[in-house]
Curated annotation (Swiss-Prot):
One of its GO terms (biological process) is 'de novo' IMP biosynthetic process. Belongs to the GARS family. Coiled coil: none annotated. Transmembrane segments: none annotated. Mn(2+) 2 binds at residues 287, 289. The gene is purD. Mn(2+) 1 binds at residues 275, 287. This is Phosphoribosylamine--glycine ligase. It catalyses: 5-phospho-beta-D-ribosylamine + glycine + ATP = N(1)-(5-phospho-beta-D-ribosyl)glycinamide + ADP + phosphate + H(+).
Length: 433
C-alpha cells in the first residue's frame, strides 16, 4: 500500500515510524516544506513543497498513485487539503476543513461548545472592539486572552502568568484586536493534560493521557513554546488524576464528535486532541486541536501495539468500533533539545551530533541536513523519548540520550522528574481540598 504523509516535523517523524512498522509493509511517501532527515530516510520518495499548496499536494498524490494519506500539522487541514484529497478519491486521516475549524477558529469553537451544551466551557465572549473587550476583562477580573486564529500554541496569554495584571491583559487585547477578533475567557486554575483520540466519524479510540510542558525553562518559567517535553504514566491516567477525571474528559470529546457531525453534516475523521485543565470541579476545555500534539504524538504512538495502518484504514472506512486497539502498559518521557536561546533568540545553523542514545528513540524536528551533517534552525530541534516500567526510569533514558546530543542546545532537565510530578500532585490535592 502507498501512503502519503503530509508534514515534516518531529510529530510527523513519529507518525512515519508508526506507519513503517506496519505488518502490511507500506511504501511511504512524504510532502514537507523542509527536508526532515528522519522522515526522508523512511520514504521511497518525498516532495519539498509548502504543505498548504493544496493543488500541488493532490498532484503529487495522484502522480505517486497514493492509496491513503495522513495529514500531520494543522495548517494544511485549515487550507482544505483533506477535502481536496477525498475529492480526488484518496482517503485521508485528518478532518475536512468544516470540522478542522474546531482548531483554527477559537471563537467558532467556543460558540459551538455553547450551542451544543458541551461540558467544560468557560465563561467567555468574542470581541472585535476595544471598549466592550476591556469592560469584560474588568467584569471577569481573571482572564485568558486568545487570538481567534492559529498561533502554533504561542498566542494565548493568561493573567497571573504572561499577563501580570488587568492593565497588561487590556494592552494585549488591544494589540490582538488590530489583527482580528479576540476571545476573552475566565481563567481556570489547575493542572493541564492532553487527551488524544483516533476518530472515524462516530467511534473514538483514546490514547493514554499526556502532560506537556509549554514553558521554556525549568520550574515552568519563561516564555511559552510549542512544547518542551511530555510524559505518560504506565496506565491511562497521570499521577495527579483520578479515573473519573479521565472518564469526564472522554465524555466531553465523544459529545464533541457527535455535535460536529450534527453541525457540519459530515463525520470527523482523523485525530482529535483535547487540551484540558483539571480544576477543583473536574476537567475543563482549554482548546481542541484537529491533529496530534507535538511532542505528545511521540509519547502515545510509541505505546501503540495495534498496527498503525490497520487503525488508519479503520478511521477512513468508519470501522474503528470493530477494531480492538491496545497500548503497552509502560510510561514514557519525551524531551526536546532546542537551539540555545530558544524561543526568543535561537542560535541557528549550529551543528548537532548524536552519540550513543542507549535505549531512547530519537525524532528529528526543525533541523536540516547539509553534506551529511545535521544543523539547527530557529525552532525545536530533536526530541528523544524514553520508555520504561515507570516514569522515573523513562526519564533517566531520555535524559541520558539528551546528554549524548552535542551542539549549541538547551533542554529542560526537570520534565518527568519525581520533584516536578510531586508538585503537580500537591497542587491538585490543594485545589480539591
Amino acid at each position: 500500500m502507498k501512503i502519503l504523509l503530509i508534514g515534516g516535523g518531529g510529530r510527523e517523524h513519529a507518525i512515519a515510524e508508526g506507519i513503517k512498522k506496519s505488518k502490511h509493509n507500506p511504501s511511504l511517501y512524504a510532502l514537507m516544506a523542509k527536508k526532515n532527515p528522519g522522515i526522508a530516510a523512511l520514504c521511497e520518495d518525498f516532495l519539498l513543497e509548502k504543505e498548504t499548496e493544496v493543488e500541488k499536494v493532490v498532484e503529487y498524490a495522484k502522480a505517486r498513485n497514493i492509496e491513503m494519506a495522513f495529514v500531520g500539522p494543522e495548517a494544511p487541514l485549515a487550507a482544505g487539503v483533506a477535502d481536496a484529497l477525498w475529492e480526488a478519491g484518496i482517503p485521508v486521516v485528518g478532518p475536512k476543513k468544516s470540522c478542522a475549524i474546531i482548531e483554527f477558529d477559537k471563537a467558532w469553537a467556543r460558540n459551538f461548545m455553547k450551542k451544543y451544551g458541551i461540558e467544560g466551557c468557560p465563561e467567555y465572549e468574542v470581541f472585535t472592539e476595544e471598549k466592550p473587550a476591556h469592560d469584560f476583562i474588568e467584569k471577569l477580573g481573571d482572564v485568558a486572552v486568545k487570538p481567534s486564529g492559529l498561533t502554533g500554541g504561542k498566542g494565548v496569554k493568561v493573567m497571573g502568568d504572561q499577563l501580570p495584571d488587568l492593565k497588561a491583559a487590556k494592552a494585549y487585547t488591544s494589540e490582538l484586536l488590530e489583527k482580528g477578533s479576540v476571545v476573552i475567557e475566565e481563567r481556570f486554575i489547575g493542572e493541564e493534560f492532553t487527551l488524544q483520540a483516533f476518530v472515524d466519524g462516530k467511534s473514538l479510540v483514546f490514547f493514554p493521557a499526556v502532560q506537556d510542558h509549554k514553558r521554556a525553562y525549568e520550574g515552568d518559567l519563561g516564555p511559552n513554546t510549542g512544547g518542551m517535553g511530555s510524559y505518560t504514566d504506565a496506565g491511562e491516567i497521570l499521577p495527579f488524576m483520578l479515573p473519573e477525571d479521565l472518564e469526564k474528559a472522554k465524555k466531553i470529546m465523544q459529545d464533541t464528535v457527535k455535535a460536529l457531525s450534527e453541525e457540519t453534516g459530515i463525520g470527523y475523521q482523523g485525530i482529535l486532541y483535547g487540551q484540558f485543565i483539571l480544576t477543583a470541579s473536574g476537567p475543563k476545555v482549554v482548546e481542541f486541536n484537529a491533529r496530534f500534539g507535538d511532542p505528545e504524538a511521540m509519547n502515545v504512538i510509541s505505546l501503540l501495539e495495534t498496527d498503525f495502518v490497520d487503525i488508519m484504514s479503520a478511521v477512513v472506512k468508519g470501522t474503528l468500533g470493530n477494531l480492538p486497539v491496545s497500548f503497552s502498559k509502560k510510561a514514557t518521557v519525551c524531551k526536546y533539545a532546542v537551539p540555545a536561546g530558544y524561543p526568543e533568540n535561537p542560535e541557528k545553523d549550529s551543528e548537532v551530533t548524536v552519540e550513543d542514545i542507549g535505549d531512547a528513540s530519537i525524532y528529528y524536528a526543525s533541523v536540516y541536513e547539509k553534506e551529511g551533517k545535521v544543523y539547527t534552525t530557529s525552532s525545536r530541534a530533536i526530541a528523544v523519548i524514553g520508555i520504561a516500567e515507570t516514569i522515573a526510569a523513562a526519564e533517566k533514558i531520555a535524559q541520558n540520550a539528551l546528554e549524548n546530543l552535542h551542539g549549541k542546545l538547551f533542554f529542560r532537565k526537570d520534565i518527568g522528574t519525581a520533584a516536578l510530578i510531586q508538585k503537580r500532585i500537591d497542587h491538585m490535592k490543594e485545589l480539591r481540598g
